[in-house]
């Protein structure tokens, strides 16, 4: 049984007492330099002592509970208490044996500290103290596409990380050639092609707090600098979050506007969907209900870039020139939409719009499994069996299998 003293009879002492494992440790007393507290029974049977009371006594640990622990820790060491016997409640320690819940609490404190760093790092851009890329909102992008029948290439964190040679999406391994092709697309000045990047720089007030903090965390360090170096400060971009209009926003107004604008794009048109196996866009919902017809080319749900030439050639062979080609295939979709647009097709990289639509229709509060469909954020343990496959199977006109 460890013998323990706690320094500080203030507000946090009870919190510390509540986390000590009484099957492993016994609290001998609470130490406080406030004479008004000394000798009282603030903590039932545990006495409040003055610092000199423990002089010469044997104990295993002294736990410092006060938030301003620096001066106390220094004074304890100067008084002769070995540093290995001092545990600061507010710091990580190699010895968690006397606590029941300390690991979870410390993890929470570390995250709070990191969030503060992320917010401070992002603040100059959010407050327009530093210049950010010019990014038009998603609704304006979709209205433009409806008017001029242009194409869409989207860049999210997966595409930027691919350019940077880093691992991001679990469904596509890093590839130098893919990274170079993505750079080519990003620099394209073809008026038929809209380049979309995520609004990760400012205007965070419309996002949920956890979504905003996740963006700040991703952009922290060298990420923002690297991405800015890839962008043209004089160019007009569009918001890549157009394909994620629901879950990350504080209210449903954005989704209320965006989904009908998407559906207007394919109303009364022949739609060819290029998707990863198990994406099943429009199945189980009415997202594509207004299309004149829907056909599909299924591709590998993982590492589709390995089969890119096969995918491109199959699309060129099967696609109707007047069809609207909708692509959901990770970073591969960005390049494919570009290559098809260059050949005169209208191609849209629609990303995870179908998952977002399912959650929107369900009123979901968090990203959750969607039976019969692969959700990129939840790669493990999903139910991918489809209850009614007849119409879906009829729509499949080609299938490219992975390695």
What are these model-predicted stretches?
Residues 37-43, 94-101, 303-310, 349, ...:
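Short, charged, surface-exposed secondary-structure boundary motifs
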Residues 100-289, 401-402:
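Electropositive, gly/pro-rich neighborhoods at or near active sites that engage anionic ligands
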Residues 21-22, 78-80, 287-291, 317, ...:
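Short, surface-exposed basic-aromatic patches at helix termini and helix-loop junctions that form
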Residues 335-403:
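C-terminal functional extensions of proteins
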Residues 1-110:
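Hydrophobic, well-ordered beta-alpha structural blocks that scaffold small-molecule cofactor pockets
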Residues 31-38, 67-69, 200, 276-280, ...:
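Short, polar loop motifs at secondary-structure junctions
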Residues 277-322:
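A mid-sequence, solvent-exposed acidic-amphipathic segment
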Residues 42-51, 78-85, 170, 209-225, ...:
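Active-site regions of enzymes building and remodeling cell-envelope glycoconjugates
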């Amino acid at each position: 049984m460890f013998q323990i003293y706690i320094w500080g009879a203030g507000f946090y002492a009870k919190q510390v007492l509540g986390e000590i494992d009484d099957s492993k440790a016994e609290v001998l007393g609470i130490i406080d330099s406030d004479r008004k507290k000394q000798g009282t029974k603030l903590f039932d049977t545990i006495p409040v002592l003055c610092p000199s009371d423990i002089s010469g006594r044997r104990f295993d640990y002294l736990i410092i509970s006060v938030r301003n622990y620096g001066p106390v820790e220094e004074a304890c060491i100067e008084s002769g208490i070995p540093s290995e016997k001092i545990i600061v409640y507010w710091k990580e320690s190699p010895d968690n044996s006397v606590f029941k819940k300390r690991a979870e609490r410390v993890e929470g404190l570390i995250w709070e500290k990191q969030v503060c760093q992320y917010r401070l790092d992002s603040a100059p851009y959010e407050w327009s103290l530093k210049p950010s890329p010019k990014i038009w909102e998603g609704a304006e992008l979709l209205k433009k596409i409806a008017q001029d029948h242009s194409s869409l290439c989207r860049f999210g964190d997966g595409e930027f990380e691919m350019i940077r040679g880093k691992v991001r999406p679990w469904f596509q391994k890093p590839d130098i050639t893919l990274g170079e092709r993505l750079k080519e697309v990003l620099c394209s000045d073809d008026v038929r092609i809209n380049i979309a990047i995520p609004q990760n720089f400012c205007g965070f007030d419309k996002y949920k707090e956890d979504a905003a903090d996740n963006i700040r965390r991703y952009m922290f360090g060298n990420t923002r600098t690297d991405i800015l170096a890839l962008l043209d400060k004089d160019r007009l971009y569009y918001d890549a979050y157009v394909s994620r209009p629901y879950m990350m926003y504080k209210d449903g107004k954005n989704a209320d506007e965006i989904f009908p604008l998407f559906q207007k794009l394919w109303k009364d048109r022949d739609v060819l969907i290029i998707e990863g196996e198990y994406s099943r866009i429009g199945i189980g919902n009415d997202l594509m209900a207004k299309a004149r017809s829907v056909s599909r080319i299924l591709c590998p749900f993982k590492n589709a870039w390995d089969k890119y030439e096969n995918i491109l050639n199959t699309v060129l062979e099967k696609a109707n020139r007047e069809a609207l080609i909708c692509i959901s295939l990770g970073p591969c979709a960005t390049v494919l939409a570009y290559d098809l647009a260059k050949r005169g097709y209208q191609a849209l990289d629609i990303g995870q719009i179908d998952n977002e639509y399912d959650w929107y229709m369900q009123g979901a509060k968090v990203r959750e499994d969607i039976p019969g469909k692969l959700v990129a954020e939840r790669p493990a343990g999903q139910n991918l069996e489809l209850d009614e496959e007849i119409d879906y199977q009829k729509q499949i006109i080609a299938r490219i299998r992975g390695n």
